[in-house]
Amino acid sequence: MKTLGIVGFGGMGEFHARQLKQMADVHVAVVVDPDGKNLERARTLFARGETKFSLNLESVLEEGVDGWIVASSTATHIQITRTILEAGGCILLEKPIAATASEALTLAPLVDADSKNLMMGHTLLWHRQFQLLTKELKNRGPIRAIHATRPRSADHRTRYPGETPFSLTMVHDLYTVFALVGGAQPKKLSAQQREHQLGGVDVAHAQLTWPDGVLAGLRADYLIPIDAAADVARDELEISGDGWSIRLPYDKGFLEVVDQGEVTKIKCELPERVGVNNFYEDAVRNELEHFIALLNDNVAVPIGARYQDACQIQEWIDRLIALAKGDD
């Protein structure tokens, strides 16, 4: 049995908590959030357990938990992560790692070389369709092109002030692309954005080119009408090579493979598990199970979820934002 602490009980913190409640080998011992309303929600969820609740982290650092899940706001990630690492803790940190790469790099002296004490919550790395895609790619030739789209509702622009689509949503595609190219550094980046007339950014485009000729084009936007059906948001990833392509429509349960003119669909089954109703919930559960296995010394942090990977990806995001603004 591993004991965990959760820091930040907003939407993502509660999402993690609900999955943790279904895991037999885990006990949530501590929940921390400076917002009293969030703590009340946590008390309701864990009403029957022996969980402690606190408005501040320092008061519960000595509880002796095995690992921490940090799901607080991005602006607080570095301070909270540093405090826990200095106390000898192990962390699963929600994306993005920080507001800037320079902030993220300040943690370097505290992170193990293999990143065992800091794993990033890059959830799509544990998505069954993405894992099936990586398996299929092992039987193919080299990747030539990558295309990803991630549309969201128009109210994202106002719900997350100060966040652009590059850092809020495109980051998911950047870390999956990072894993697909084995962490290789692109030789060229370019980016464009549209600034909304009422403030903020609602469309972001990015292009990345690698020395071996791989091209990636990514788009993230906040253009879906607010009252549209939930399934209108169609996140997709498409990988192309010489004579073949594989399309991954997230959460649809299949891959579409085009090979030498023939089109086939490969099914991806969602296993029946209590508390798991869709592929994203399944991915979060898989991610949490990996973190527990990491605490038990049974696995390593995968490429794309290591501290050094997160720093490199944040450097990409910083550069893309600057390029889109015309500052670079």
Which positions does each model-derived feature cover?
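Mid-domain beta-loop-alpha active-site segment that forms a flexible
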Residues: 121-128, 154-186, 200-202
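Beta-loop-alpha module in the N-terminal Rossmann-like domain of NAD(P)-dependent dehydrogenases
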Residues: 16, 46-108
